[in-house]
């Protein structure tokens, strides 16, 4: 039960399976002042103690760090949590992670979507395996010990090797954690969430067959 305010509409990415990324074009952002005022009013007028910054990809907002710093001025003293449900791997920076950690104490969620670089390129998910690992490294260095990775199965051109790559990617993240220095006895939790591809109208994959 939380307040929700939309920070942007549309998406700059163009993943070929994502209907929302096409039907909500063009991409446009709300200003920092408007978002901050809406969130403040929602919490003060309706009694919420958590506000979600909603969008297809919240970390793509060009002034997200400024927005979070401004919201934390009133949110921290009043114990209001900020939820950022959509974080892009290639948009994360150490400063942004530091701000996220102040408002999100649990784990982080990222979406590589596919288990191989070939398939990520095919679906226009423009992130590399190295970016996945680099972002997880930043997360671990910031003190996080839980990471959730979202993937899809049944994507067009998918092979068994792509499926195996999902487990391989998760294992690389685990190995990365244990290759770093941590307090003794502090383990890592890497959760894999897998959804089945469903072809959607108005996307490049709209006429692709769905696996049975």
Where are these regions (language model features)?
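Short glycine-enriched, charge-decorated loop/helix-capping segments at active-site entrances
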Residues: 22, 123-127, 206-212
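Conserved catalytic alpha/beta cores of large enzymes that bind or transform nucleotide phosphates
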Residues: 8-9, 24, 38-43, 47
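Canonical Radical SAM [4Fe-4S] cluster-binding loop centered on the CxxxCxxC motif
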Residues: 2-33
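Radical SAM enzyme [4Fe-4S]-AdoMet core and its adjacent flexible, acidic
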Residues: 194-212
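Ordered, soluble secondary-structure elements with a strong preference for glycine-centered loop motifs
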Residues: 29, 160, 209
């Amino acid at each position: 039960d939380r307040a929700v305010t939309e920070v942007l509409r549309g998406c700059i990415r163009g993943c070929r399976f994502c209907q929302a990324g096409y039907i909500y074009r063009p991409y446009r952002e709300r200003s920092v002042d408007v978002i901050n005022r809406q969130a403040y009013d929602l919490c003060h007028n309706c009694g919420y103690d958590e506000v979600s910054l909603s969008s297809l990809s919240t970390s793509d907002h060009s002034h997200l760090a400024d927005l979070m710093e401004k919201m934390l001025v009133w949110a921290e003293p009043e114990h209001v949590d900020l939820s950022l449900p959509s974080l892009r791997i290639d948009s994360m920076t150490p400063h942004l992670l530091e701000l996220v950690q102040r408002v999100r104490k649990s784990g982080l969620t990222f979406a590589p979507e596919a288990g191989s670089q070939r398939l990520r390129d095919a679906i226009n998910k423009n992130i590399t395996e190295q970016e996945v690992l680099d972002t997880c490294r930043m997360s671990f260095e910031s003190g996080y010990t839980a990471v959730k990775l979202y993937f899809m199965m049944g994507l067009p051109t998918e092979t068994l090797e792509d499926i195996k790559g999902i487990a391989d990617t998760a294992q690389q993240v685990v190995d990365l954690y244990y290759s770093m220095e941590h307090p003794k006895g502090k383990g890592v939790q890497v959760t894999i969430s897998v959804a089945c591809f469903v072809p959607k109208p108005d996307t490049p994959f709209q006429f692709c067959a769905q696996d049975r």
